[in-house]
C-alpha cells in the first residue's frame, strides 16, 4: 500500500502526500498559527471545502503559482474562475479523478460564502490515495456520517473539534462512532479563542470505541 504523509498547516489546512500532493483548505496568510507561506507549498491538486476565507484564502494564489487546479463547489468554482484560477467543479455526491487521485464530495452542515457572495454547498471530501482520507470540512455532526462510514469506508478521518462554528469534541466523538475510522485527526481548533478545545479529551473518548487519535503538531509530518 502506498505510503502516506499528512502534514497539518494549522486550522483545517492539510497536505496529503503520497505519489501526489493534495492540499486541502489553504489558509496560511492570515492564519495566526501557520508556519509556512503559500509560495512554499507545491501541490498537484487543491481541494476547498467551502468559500470562507479561513478555508480558501490562499487557494487562487497557490493554484496560479503551481498550476494545480482547485476542486470546489460549482458556484465557488465559477467565482474563482473570475479570478483566473483553474478549477474543477463538483457537488456533494459527485466524484472526480485527477492524476490517479479519486475525490468524492460529501455533504457538510455549514454555510459558504466568498467575499460576501453565495458560494454553493459546503462539503467534505473522501480522498482516495491508496488509503482513504475523509476531510469533513466545517460541519456539525449529521446522521448521514453513518453512510460515509458504510459506503466510503475511510481509513482516516480529519474532524473539526473546536465548536462554535462546527461540532465540538462531543460531536466529533459521535462522528467517530458513525464513521468508524481506524485513525482520527482533530482539526479546526485552537486557531482562535472562539474555537478552543482539548484534543486529549477527544483522543480519550475515541479510544473507547477503538479509533486511534493522532494529535497533530503544525508542520510535523505524520507517516502512515
Swiss-Prot record:
Pfam family membership, one: Lactamase_B_3
An example molecular function term from Gene Ontology annotations: hydrolase activity
Domain of life according to the entry: Archaea
SMART domains: Lactamase_B
Keyword Calcium: no
Keywords: Hydrolase
Classification via HAMAP family: UPF0173
Family in the record: Belongs to the UPF0173 family.
Protein's name according to its UniProt entry: UPF0173 metal-dependent hydrolase Ta0764
